[in-house]
Amino acid sequence: MKSVGLITEYNPFHNGHLFHATLSKQRSETNVTIAIMSGNFVMRGEPAIYHKFKRTEMALSAVDLVVELPLIGSLSSSDTFAEIAIKTAQYLDIDIISFGSESASLKDLQYLATQMIDYEKHPDFKEKLKQGKSYPRILSELTHNDTLLQSPNNILGISYLKAMQQFAPHMSALTIKREGSLHHQKVIDHHHFASGTSIRRSLMNDNVDWKNVVPNQIQSLYCKPHTTVEDTFPFIKHQLITQPKESLHSIYTINEGFENRLQTMIHRSDSFESLLSNLNTKRYTQTYIQRVLMNVLLNITKDDVNKEINAVRVLGMSEKGRSYLKYLKANYPNRHYITNVNQKTAHYFKNEIKATHVYNLLSNQSQTDFNTPLVRI
Amino acid sequence: MKSVGLITEYNPFHNGHLFHATLSKQRSETNVTIAIMSGNFVMRGEPAIYHKFKRTEMALSAVDLVVELPLIGSLSSSDTFAEIAIKTAQYLDIDIISFGSESASLKDLQYLATQMIDYEKHPDFKEKLKQGKSYPRILSELTHNDTLLQSPNNILGISYLKAMQQFAPHMSALTIKREGSLHHQKVIDHHHFASGTSIRRSLMNDNVDWKNVVPNQIQSLYCKPHTTVEDTFPFIKHQLITQPKESLHSIYTINEGFENRLQTMIHRSDSFESLLSNLNTKRYTQTYIQRVLMNVLLNITKDDVNKEINAVRVLGMSEKGRSYLKYLKANYPNRHYITNVNQKTAHYFKNEIKATHVYNLLSNQSQTDFNTPLVRI
């Protein structure tokens, strides 16, 4: 069975995702479509607007199998996000990764990926890192401001391609053009497509524009967001007040004394938004800061980080997904494809289970990894 | 200057406290009255209904000097509470401790205190502790159910007397009769006196009964409680979900694997009240459990515990209190009587400062140890 993998967040699922999934199937000429989806927290450094179980249901309108991207992936910068996603794809024996990019030229992106693997070995690169420059800035300096590197989906695509070269050399890639300008748009101004940001805003504000830009047959799944990032603030404040510096220092992604800045700024902040603006410096991107705060919220320490895949959490599947899972289990009897979490399998997913408990605390939801059955359609 | 010390919580201050302070002054024939008062968290294992600054203002209607009982004292069982309170009194050169008791016979209580110091050295005592019996139960067995030990203020008084024998042999004691039956009454049914419980309830429910039982001249200080113990629940739940077992194990007062019970029961609980009832066993008293939960909330670890007094935090004073402080500073130039907390003195009060920050998070108050001047009348 030939399979195509999509690395996704579906926060929430919309027509752009449907379009990408449909084209990916056609162009890859594969039988099975697999989404590797972020769980309850997303790469922007926020809780997802709906929990992963609902987002799985949405996803199954377009794909055959939904597995959870390990939490560490979702709360890392693009290279680690890509590494963990590609290793997950490898574990699932995926043949082709299909990703959206502004460029849509696989050749150009491949060329940059190869170049960047070289750049990163260069002494200049390490020197600039030491000087406190951000990773995207260094790359754009080293590549003489290559315009390809000014588009977020190109950057992520290049990270996938780098990870594939390093960790999954037999996997192939496919890229589908997406409109960069859409990505950060604040309001819905297109008849069929809109950015995640504008859709989340529409759902939050109870305005019905979102109805035009999500697939008809799953509209009943959409409701007011389960939670927003502001709900995290009291808990983050509590952590920053009560944890000693050494504990904060051990939190994943905190480095260079950022814990000091956190403990100073928390006393001047009375909302997530004000904390972000107090923490803002040239040195760090907003998403870096948000991911740090989510790692604080979830108490993810450097010791909790494992970039290897020892098991994959299956969140949902269609009939075709079920056949594919059978095929995987037959071919890789020593791998762990887990469709239900229980006392025996929970140890593989400690971070994800914790994230679900915290998500429920934020959102007053009650579906846990233990009490929620595999989603099937 | 001869001084009398009152070990108090004033949660909130009421006529019973005024009565006790007045009689203490008369009977001790002293010039200065000093309250050693719990800060923002009280021995019942709860946040106080008003922050310590407001409670200091209330207290100064009856006493000359208000100092803060170190947080560790407030969140410990009666022996450690008493030890830290008596050591604080010693640091303040207090001559006489005056406490309320149901018995009112200093001789009887002294006799029991001496007996109990002996009992605690007895192998039987340690054996019973190992069997998992609670401290009050063992004592009542060893003293053949002495009726004196069935009244909470007698027990606390005996703890003071024991601590004085051990740590402040030159300090003397005075006890004033209080009506035991009042202590836990739920409603106000007396014209002038009522229990703290019934007064807190009246304030919470916006019923005006409390007005009859607090001193007239300070009634304007009373308002709806700043917070209740239920406000702590989301934060405690968050801690119990996100902290690994080893971290919980290091929390002060947690022992014998109580961390396991906490992590199991938190998932079955959706309020502080339900958590308490889920945690309830014969082995532990409710106040023990509540104090454990406050130590979790404040992240007070075993390493944060210091039973020695290296400085005393002065919260408020009258003119007479000011003279006494002058006298202390002249006589003990190496001791630290701190009237304002700043970067230089903050290290003495790490636990108390943290408790204030958490109290403010719970209650939406904004008076910190740094921005609140000494209360003076």
Curated annotation (Swiss-Prot), chains A, B:
Binding site for ATP: 7-20, 100, 153, 178
The keyword Translocase belongs to this UniProt entry's keyword annotation: no
Annotated EC: 6.3.4.-
One MF term in the entry's GO annotations: ligase activity, forming carbon-nitrogen bonds
Similarity section: Belongs to the TmcAL family.
Enzyme class: ligase
One example of a Gene Ontology biological process annotation: tRNA modification
Classification via Pfam families: HIGH_NTase1
The organism's taxonomic lineage, starting at the top: Bacteria, Bacillati, Bacillota, Bacilli, Bacillales
Organism the protein comes from: Staphylococcus epidermidis (strain ATCC 35984 / DSM 28319 / BCRC 17069 / CCUG 31568 / BM 3577 / RP62A)
Any one GO cellular component localisation term in the record: cytoplasm
Catalysed reaction equations from the record: cytidine(34) in elongator tRNA(Met) + acetate + ATP = N(4)-acetylcytidine(34) in elongator tRNA(Met) + AMP + diphosphate
Localization: Cytoplasm
Key words, A-Z: ATP-binding, Cytoplasm, Ligase, Nucleotide-binding, RNA-binding, tRNA processing, tRNA-binding
Entry-linked SUPFAM superfamilies: Nucleotidylyl transferase
Record's protein name: tRNA(Met) cytidine acetate ligase
Domain of life: Bacteria
Predominant localisation class: cytoplasm
The UniProt record lists the keyword Protein biosynthesis: no
Functional description taken from the UniProt entry: Catalyzes the formation of N(4)-acetylcytidine (ac(4)C) at the wobble position of elongator tRNA(Met), using acetate and ATP as substrates. First activates an acetate ion to form acetyladenylate (Ac-AMP) and then transfers the acetyl group to tRNA to form ac(4)C34.
